[in-house]
From Swiss-Prot:
Keywords from the named record: Electron transport, Heme, Iron, Metal-binding, Transport
PTM description: Binds 1 heme c group covalently per subunit.
Family according to the record: Belongs to the cytochrome c family.
UniProt-listed SUPFAM superfamilies: Cytochrome c (SSF46626)
InterPro entries, sorted: Cyt_c-like_dom (IPR009056), Cyt_c-like_dom_sf (IPR036909), Cyt_c_1A/1B (IPR002327)
Sites where the protein binds heme c: 14, 17-18, 83
GO terms assigned for molecular function: electron transfer activity; heme binding; metal ion binding
UniProt protein name: Cytochrome c2
Length: 111
């Protein structure tokens, strides 16, 4: 189990490209509200890479474990995706970040 407060601090790196929480909008990357249980490439208001759309079309749904695998090595998990992150190598940081995403992703995106 991760620490939500530490995950919020870890998300600061992500916030350059992603928004989460009440009123979140797509930025360089998609907003992350409702990410758990969302099909990869599944936000109709975001222009995903073909690689991400293909992953979703093949059935990839974001679970905590799938997010962990992706965030640890985005280009390995989904070659050709647009995410600039090289990967998060520390298991504790991944735990905290995923705890924060689960906690915060229940918010609704901006209308």
């Amino acid at each position: 189990e991760g620490d939500v407060a530490k995950g919020e601090a870890a998300f600061k790196r992500c916030s350059a490209c992603h928004a989460i929480g009440e009123g979140a909008k797509n930025k360089v990357g998609p907003q992350l509200n409702g990410i758990i249980g969302r099909t990869a490439g599944g936000d109709p208001d975001y222009n995903y890479s073909n690689a991400m759309k293909k992953a979703g079309g093949e059935g990839l749904v974001w679970t905590p474990q799938e997010l962990r695998d992706f965030l640890s090595a985005p280009k390995k998990k989904i070659p050709g995706n647009k995410m600039a992150l090289a990967g998060i190598s520390k298991p504790e940081e991944l735990d905290n970040l995923i705890a924060y995403l689960i906690f915060s992703a229940s918010s609704k995106p901006a209308z």
